[in-house]
Amino acid sequence: MNFSHLYDIYYNRINKKLFEIIQELPFQDSVLFRAMKYSTLSGGKRLRACLIYATGETFQVNIAALDVISAAVELVHSYSLIHDDLPCIDNDYFRRGKISCHIKYGENFALLAGDALQGLAFNILSNSNMPGVHDSIRLKMIAEFSNAIGYSGMCIGQMLDLEKERKKINISELEKINLYKTAFLIRCSIRLAYFASNNFSKEVLFILDKFSVSIGLAFQIQDDILDLKNDIKKLESKRNKTKNTYPLLIGLKKSKIKIKELYKEAFFTLEILKKNFNVNILKLLTQFIMKRFK
């Protein structure tokens, strides 16, 4: 079985859901609406949504509930990218093959668009129908979501990234940045899908956390490598000018070895889950993501 077909199904499903959510918003003639729509529907890999759907399949979660979780997570991811690109953070002119939101609509409206998308994500997670999900579980999901994207998660990761910019750091410090900045939202995505199954087990959650952190860290290193496009001259010329990344810190060869180690850890956790659950789709998804850097 090939995951590509299933990826297309997940990808199209979440894009349709996001389009429906955006199209239901008021003030559609406003710059704010256009900025939100532009950033949310301008492509992207939808990795987090795919992980949510695949995890949901593993634990037999109603797909309508997975739609809600996926939409909330992807809206927050879009918000984070808008803010990451701002001049005060990464000052990036391009995102997903297009000009960044603040370049197209201005810094003021980009800032507001990010804020509005975050609020919309919580609105969706709080109020949308999620069949089979009790209110107590919904509250647990909201608490997990807010923790993953706030002070104890994504925001502290971004702070650490900015704080260490242009400074020499070690691998341990870099992994901490990637853990908070990237892996924790991926962990949250998988946790929310698992919570929606209403079958909570600390042991299973621990295994899923190991899986998601391995995937999240590997994915971040892959992105760092893809950004450099294996251009050694670019690597050398930017060594003292760019943010800290694995390829800049330890080189491309060791970075690829690290990716393989992380995916090996991810597959190991799936083998443990395999004893009680059907993890075939999660395994196929992991293999699919792995191919991005080969």
Swiss-Prot record:
It catalyses: isopentenyl diphosphate + (2E)-geranyl diphosphate = (2E,6E)-farnesyl diphosphate + diphosphate. Keywords: Cytoplasm, Isoprene biosynthesis, Magnesium, Metal-binding, Transferase. Signal peptide: none annotated. One of its GO terms (cellular component) is cytoplasm. It is found in: Cytoplasm. GO terms for biological process: isoprenoid biosynthetic process. (2E)-geranyl diphosphate binds at R95, K181, T182, Q220. It is an enzyme of class 2 (transferase). Its main location: cytoplasm. Binds 2 Mg(2+) ions per subunit. Transmembrane segments: none annotated. GO terms for molecular function: (2E,6E)-farnesyl diphosphate synthase activity; metal ion binding. It comes from the Bacteria. The keyword DNA damage does not apply. Mg(2+) 1 binds at D84, D90. Gene3D superfamilies: Farnesyl Diphosphate Synthase (1.10.600.10). Mg(2+) 2 binds at D84, D90. InterPro entries: Isoprenoid_synthase_dom_sf, Polyprenyl_synt, Polyprenyl_synt_CS. Belongs to the FPP/GGPP synthase family. This is Farnesyl diphosphate synthase. It comes from Buchnera aphidicola subsp. Schizaphis graminum (strain Sg).
